[in-house]
Every structure is written in structure tokens, then in C-alpha cells.
Amino acid sequence: MGRREEMIAKIKELMTQPERIRNMGIAAHIDHGKTTLSDNLLAGAGMISEELAGKQLVLDFDEQEQARGITINAANVSMVHNYEGQDYLINLIDTPGHVDFGGDVTRAMRAIDGAIIVVDAVEGVMPQTETVLRQALREYVKPVLFINKVDRLIKELKLGPNEILQRFAKIITDVNRLIKRYAPEEFKSQWMVKVEDGSVAFGSAYYNWALSVPFMKKTGVSFKDIVELTNKGDLKGLRQKAPLHVVVLDMVVRHLPNPLEAQKYRIPHLWRGDINSDVGQAMLKCDPKGKMVMVVTKIILDKHAGEVATGRVWSGTVKTGQEVYLINSKRKARIQQVGIYMGPERINMEAVPAGNIVAVTGLRDAMAGETVSVEKIEPFEALHYTSEPVVTVAIEAKNVKDLPKLIEALRQLAKEDPTLHVKIDEETGQHLLSGMGELHLEVKLYRLKTEWKLDVDVSPPIVVYRESVTKKSPIVEGKSPNKHNRFYITVEPMPDEIYEAIREGIIPEGRPKNPKEVAKKLAELGMDYELAKGIVDVYNGNMFFDNTKGIQYLNEVMDLLVDGFHMAMDEGPLAKEPVMKVIVRLHDAKIHEDNVHRGPAQIYPAIRTAIHCAMMKAGPVLYEPYQKVIINIPYEYMGAVSRELNQRRGQLIDMRQEGEVMIIIGEAPVAEMFGFAGAIRGATSGKALWTTEHAGFKRVPNELAQQIIRQIRQRKGLDPNPPTEKDVCPQQ
């Protein structure tokens, strides 16, 4: 095992030299080659065998588990790369595989300082490339560009060198346009990617070769040589002349920042505490002697060790046996094992210093996004997931004895993919799986079958709707069952600007730590500052304000009122679907002095009924989720595809031609999109490539709303007739 020990010794030595560390990720549109690139980088750095890496995608799904273990489960892989005679430690963090991470600040982006953006040379910059790039730049992650699948330009599209260079120039211009739009002010110009300085590389991850201008200058290999070797089919020659991992990892070392550089500008942006405090200064300097602070970015279930939490160490040193605080969970824990990932295996270490990615056990119940420190400090900005699951299926194990295995599998899927919501009901054995669309759920169900060998019954897919209001309600009185407590509230629709600010994370979900600051932001967005100061809670895109003056005992029941507000928002009055874009204001209250008469059994019904009654007086409406569909098709199928979209209440947003291919971008309600895959394959003889992403919610047309409310109520075992104001509001 000489080589392995040598590698571990090298990693241990480099861990203490932050200027030699690079924490990076790979981000791409689906199918642009992220996995192949990461596997081949690992193979090149000697972490998995080269044979495996090439074949990994050729093997089919089941046998792939060992081969694939690395891309499915490894949260982070450390490798050593020699650049100009010096060794560097490169931590590659696996960004979640599925592209349905819509707007979430993917946990991985928090832990890395730089990212390789992968773009398919044939398809160019796609909508999801924009999503991941925006994500990275929002977290102050510096990008470099890898243009992949260049072999297809040479062999399939038979383009000459000049046409290929034109294609590259367009992709680079498109990427730089996005960098200019989304990068932080101070980095807009210096983070642009350029061919001449080597912050752009191009090649084929599948065939394991790559080129960049610095590499061509250094070795004398020219693009013409590559074209000749590709046309000859000399794959070995390609790999030897222009090895992928050398070119790409050289680019990483040269252009992506080390933790010492990156933390100077990232900490003030990501952390809300006082930068001049000891901890603040230690994090700015990435000081291994400071107080230990780490942020958990991913949780993996290890068969032997239980839950392993991986995360970034911002300051201090993580040590075995250390007593730590989990800041968000408000509890203590003791770190048991400390280690790092080398390839797919976890290597135990005594300690891991600042600037590294660590894997620890012992942090029971920690969620991704948790701040862990040796003392109570301000937590890092919450990781907010703005993607909203819009389709649900119910799953049951066909065989009762598979139940524990199914629960385990669902929990694991949910931990790997934050956009998947799993509701486990151990009593009925019926579990709900909610995802971003039919396709997203199909992929997950396929994995239950192939990887977990589970036989399950799946219900037809159900769309998740939302309820909202269209105008301000009059003041409504809510009385507790014992008549001793009265609350006077109104509801009103939330302005789009405020809703967007919540989705973007500018206004954080939850009870605000600093209400004045949130009120200031709300005032900037057009709300009266005096009213905005009453902000109590932000919940799933809804808000609760206390606009009362000097009410006795109100503080004692505020927690109960917030819980009641949550209940009212989880199930709206029309069809018990979640509520969105509603502002609830408390204007006045009369509260019994004796706390026996103002417990949960009195307060919950009072506030919940009042909110629902106010909603019924405020023009209640149903919203439905929409999907954006991006379809690539040969020109002659244009008509068939637009017909298919029109039949589904969809509309065309944009069309553009790239060579022989038409790219159509449309939007349609998720409810109409079931079976779209089969229909589109049929209409285009299987020649369409397509992806979808979440496109927010829109109002259901009035003529359909009543019918849909009926269907939902029937499915939930409620009286199918849509409720009226009389049904919801208590008779005085």
C-alpha cells in the first residue's frame, strides 16, 4: 500500500499550508458532463483507476454502484496535484447531481471558493448554466470555464477549426455576459474568463483530453494535432498528448483562490457577526490557532459510522473529542472521529485546520447549514432553499418486511437532494415523496428500484397547489372557544417585490433576529416603516405582523400566535393546500390575565379561524405551479412541438436556432405536463432533448378553479363543495 500511505502523508502536510489549498466544485446544466469530468480528474490524480473512470458511464446503473459510489455519496474528495514543481491539495466538492436545485443556495457553494462551470460545446450556455453560475456568484465563488464535448463538434458536426473557434467565442461571450450581470460589484471585471490567460479550457471529459492556451504554449501541442487524432480515433494518443486532469487542475491552481485569499472577501458577505471580534478576525485570516468555527454542508449516512457531517472549517482546528455548540439547534455535542475524504474513503486524522474540508462524526441531528463552534457565536447566513416541490406521489412498500429499508432509502434520498421532500408516516406505511416535477420523481423512483432493490406501489402524481388572496380584508375578530380571548386581524396580498425578496433570501425566513433591519428592507420595498416594524415571522413566503399598541399579556401568547399562523398557512381555507404571498396583521387583542385560560387549546383555534375567515373575505384564489420547458429539436419538428405545448395551456417564450437545432423555451402548468415525455417523443420520433425547471406559481383561471378545488377536496376526503364565507367564518 506504499502509494496510498504516501498520498495520505502528502495530504497531511499540505493541509497545514492554506496557500497550497484549493476548495472547488463543478457546476453544469444536466448532461453537460459534470460527473464524467469529476471522475476523470480523480483518476488522473490517482484516486480511482483510469479504466474505471472511462467506463463508469458505460456500465449500466446497477453494476455501477461501486464505480459510482464516488459521485453519489462522496461529499468531498481530496487529491494532490503537482503544478510547476509544487504540490497542491485540491478538495473537489460534489455539488448535488440533479439540476432541480432551482434557486437554492446549494450547500456545496457555501464550502467552496471557486467553481469550474462546464458547458457543452454543442448546446452552448443553457438556462440552467445561468442558474448555477448565478448561484456561485451570489456566494462569492469565483468561476473558470471548461467547454466540454468538443469531440462532437469535430466528429458529429464536422466543423472546421475556424468554426469551432467561433463556437468557443460565443460561449465565452455568453458566460462573461452572465458574470458581468451577477458577479459582486468589486469582481465584475477581474472574474471575466479569458482564453489567453488560461481561465478557459476546452476538451472532452469522456475521452479524457483537454487544452488551454498556457498548456499549448508550454507543450507545443496545437488544436490541429487534436483534430487529427480525433478524426483518426486515436484515443490513447489524445490522452497522452493533452491529459485532461493536468490541463484542468493547472487551471484550478492558477486561477481559483486559496482559502487565505477567499476568506478575506467571503466572510464579511456570508457571516453576520462582528468582523472585528476575535472570531471574526480569525475567520478573515483563516487562522488555525483561532476559535474553531465550521459550517456543515452535507450529511452522509455511513453504514459503520452513522451520520457523517462534512463541512468547511473557517477558523481554528477541528479535533477529536472537542466539545462544540450547534448554534442553530442550540445544543452541545462532542466530536468523535475527525477525517477527510480521499477518493471514496474516509481517512481518520487527529485534527483538521482552517481552510480545509472536514468529515466528522458525533454531531447528531446536525442539518446542512448548521454552524458549529467552540462557543456561542452568530450563525452563518442560513442556507435557504427556494425551490418548491410541486408534484407529490404516495409510495408504499409492496412487501411489509421492506418497510424499514424503504424508510432508510427515502431518508437517504432526501439528505442527498435538498429539493426532494419526504414525509414519512410510519403508522400507515404510506410515504409522500414531493419533487420538482414528474421527471425528477421518476429518477428517484428508478433509484429505489435499482440501487435499493425495492418493490414499491406508487400513486398517480398529484400537483401541489397554493392558496392566496387578491385584496385586503376587513378586520375580523377571532374568539377563543372559552370567549376570554379575542384577536382582531386583517390579511392582504403580498406585493411581488417583497415575495421575490423572500425567495432570494434578502428577507430571511423565520423569526427575524434583527426586526429593525428587516423593517428597513421592507420600507425600501414600499411598505410603511411604522407597520413594517411589527414584523414577527416569515413563513413559507407569508408574513405575520404585530401592529398592536401596548396589549397586556401579548408577549406571553406570541409563540402560540405564531404557531397558529403556521397552521393557518400550512392548510388554507379553500382546499387545505399551503398558502403563499399573504400578509397577516394583528391590530388589536384582548387576552385573559390567567394563563390557564389562554393555553394552546384556546389560542390556536382563535387565530387560525380568524385568518381563514379574513382570507375568505379577501378574494381567495388558487395558484398552480408552472414549469419552464427547454426543448432542443431538429427544425422540422417545430410545428409538432408548439402544438403539443398549446394543447397543455402552455405558451412559447423564446425560440432560437443554433446550427441545425432549434431551441424552444416555453412555460406550462405542471398539472398539464404529465405524460409530456411520451407525447413529445412520439411527436418528434424520439429526436427531442428536453429539460424542465420550476417557473413559479400563477393564478388558476377562474373557470378551472372551482373544478380543481372540488377534485382536491374529494381526494382529501372533505365535502367536495368549495366552502363559502359562511362555512369558514364563525357565526357571531
Curated annotation (Swiss-Prot):
It comes from the Archaea. CDD domains: aeEF2_snRNP_like_IV, EF2, EF2_II, EF2_snRNP_III, Elongation_Factor_C. One of its GO terms (cellular component) is ribonucleoprotein complex. GTP binds at residues 28-35, 94-98, 148-151. Keywords: Cytoplasm, Elongation factor, GTP-binding, Nucleotide-binding, Protein biosynthesis. Residues 19-230 form the tr-type G domain. Its main location: cytoplasm. One of its GO terms (molecular function) is translation elongation factor activity. It is found in: Cytoplasm. The modification Diphthamide is found at H597. It holds the Pfam family EFG_IV. Catalyzes the GTP-dependent ribosomal translocation step during translation elongation. During this step, the ribosome changes from the pre-translocational (PRE) to the post-translocational (POST) state as the newly formed A-site-bound peptidyl-tRNA and P-site-bound deacylated tRNA move to the P and E sites, respectively. Catalyzes the coordinated movement of the two tRNA molecules, the mRNA and conformational changes in the ribosome. PANTHER family: ELONGATION FACTOR-LIKE GTPASE 1, TRANSLATION ELONGATION FACTOR-RELATED. NCBIfam families: aEF-2, small_GTP. Belongs to the TRAFAC class translation factor GTPase superfamily. Classic translation factor GTPase family. EF-G/EF-2 subfamily. This is Elongation factor 2.
